[in-house]
């Protein structure tokens, strides 16, 4: 049985994620707030979900240290703030959008990174397992005012999804099992969110 940690960045959506994961796995997952767990304790877990949250990654307790410590060792999925933190941990910048997305459904385009990943690291499974069986374009729920910037985007990351304005909506590491989504798979505004989470939990 995989041990799952939901790393809670003090967000009201965290328990929606927890309930979705527990529904899929039929097992309890552990939830710790970002300043209520020791960094070494995180080593007990196989898969880590970095929850959404208010503010910026550097204000979120152990969020950035966790990514820097465990990206090469653990399977990590970042959602919203968690996704932004993954970008930032590897050197990306964040930009503040003029338009705030709060409970807005928009289309995202999935970018095929399988070939790029296979070339970079033939031993790694295809980087887009997260989107396995999902259409190339899908509707997602968004609650954010910041995005990972394309300018200076780290060479060790891939962009896996974009919105209609070409903003980054998904990313993955080229060699580590680390992925992020700017949108909320646990939201009712993301009809295929459960399928996406099933893909990640099965990988």
What are the residue ranges of the model-derived segments?
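Cysteine-nucleophile active-site neighborhood
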Residues: 45-133, 197-199
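A short beta-strand-loop structural module common to alpha/beta enzyme folds
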Residues: 27-36
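Catalytic beta-strand/loop cores that center a nucleophilic Ser/Cys/Thr
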Residues: 117-175
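Acyltransferase
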Residues: 188-203
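Extreme N-terminal starter segment of soluble prokaryotic enzymes
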Residues: 1-5
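Short amphipathic alpha-helix with an adjacent loop that forms part of the alpha/beta core around
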Residues: 37-45
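Two-component/phosphorelay signaling modules centered on CheY-like receiver
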Residues: 18-26
């Amino acid at each position: 049985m995989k041990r799952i940690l939901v790393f809670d960045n003090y967000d009201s959506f965290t328990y929606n994620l927890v309930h979705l994961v527990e529904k899929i796995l039929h097992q309890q997952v552990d939830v710790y707030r970002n300043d209520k767990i020791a960094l070494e304790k995180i080593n007990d877990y196989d898969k880590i979900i970095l929850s959404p949250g208010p503010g910026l990654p550097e204000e979120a307790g152990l969020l950035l240290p966790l990514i820097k410590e465990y990206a090469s060792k653990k399977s990590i999925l970042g959602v919203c703030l968690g996704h932004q933190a993954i970008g930032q941990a590897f050197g990306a910048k964040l930009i503040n959008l003029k338009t705030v997305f709060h409970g807005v459904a928009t289309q995202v385009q999935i970018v095929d990174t399988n070939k790029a990943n296979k070339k970079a690291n033939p031993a790694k499974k295809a980087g887009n397992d997260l989107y396995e069986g999902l259409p190339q374009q899908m509707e997602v729920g968004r609650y954010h005012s910041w995005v990972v910037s394309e300018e200076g985007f780290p060479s060790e990351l891939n962009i896996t999804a974009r919105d209609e304005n070409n903003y980054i909506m998904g990313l993955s590491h080229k060699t580590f099992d680390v992925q992020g989504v700017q949108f909320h798979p646990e939201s009712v505004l993301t009809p295929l969110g459960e399928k996406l989470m099933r893909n990640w939990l099965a990988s």
